[in-house]
Amino acid sequence: MGVLSEFKAFAVKGNVVDMAVGIIIGAAFGKIVSSFVGDVVMPPIGLLIGGVNFGDLAVTLKAAAGDTPAVVLAYGKFIQSIIDFVIIAFAIFMGVKVINRLKREEAVAPTLPPVPTKEEELLGEIRDLLKAQNNKP
């Protein structure tokens, strides 16, 4: 029973749950960026350089022979993947930069001294009265 309770404690920790949520959101974000690059960014770039569809850019290393498929080096898809990576990396960089700035602002904010309670004020007055009585000749 010890292993199961340890696993439960591990799995329920906030860090593990936060990490799982981050992975799921990251996977969804990756799909959005891939669609953005493939469907929005690359078509205008292809038009600018002569109507080229980057997904179709490839070099055939060995032509198809009979039932054997062709050996193709699909460098256009690789270019799209590089652009995907750059956009995702930039978005993550900007997110981390914002989080770090917020953390810095929290750390820099001065902490005000606590306001004394009524009891503390009364104790201070009693102390001052006792000091005054002790200093009288």
Curated annotation (Swiss-Prot):
What is the species of this protein?
Answer: Pseudomonas fluorescens (strain ATCC BAA-477 / NRRL B-23932 / Pf-5)
Its record classes its membrane topology as: Multi-pass membrane protein
User: What family is reported?
Assistant: Belongs to the MscL family.
Tell me the GO molecular function terms: mechanosensitive monoatomic ion channel activity
> Which InterPro entries does the UniProt entry name for this protein?
Mechanosensitive_channel_CS, MS_channel, MSC/AndL, MscL_channel
Which residue windows are transmembrane per the record? 9-29, 32-52, 54-74, 79-99
| Domain of life, source organism | Bacteria
Quaternary structure and interacting proteins, as annotated: Homopentamer.
Q: Which HAMAP family match?
A: MscL
Q: What is this protein called?
A: Large-conductance mechanosensitive channel
A single Gene Ontology CC annotation of this entry is: plasma membrane
Q: From the Swiss-Prot or TrEMBL record, state where the protein is found.
A: Cell inner membrane
Xref: Pfam families: MscL
Instruction: Recite the UniProt keywords alphabetically.
Output: Cell inner membrane, Cell membrane, Ion channel, Ion transport, Membrane, Transmembrane, Transmembrane helix, Transport
Q: What is its main location?
A: membrane
Job description of the protein: Channel that opens in response to stretch forces in the membrane lipid bilayer. May participate in the regulation of osmotic pressure changes within the cell.
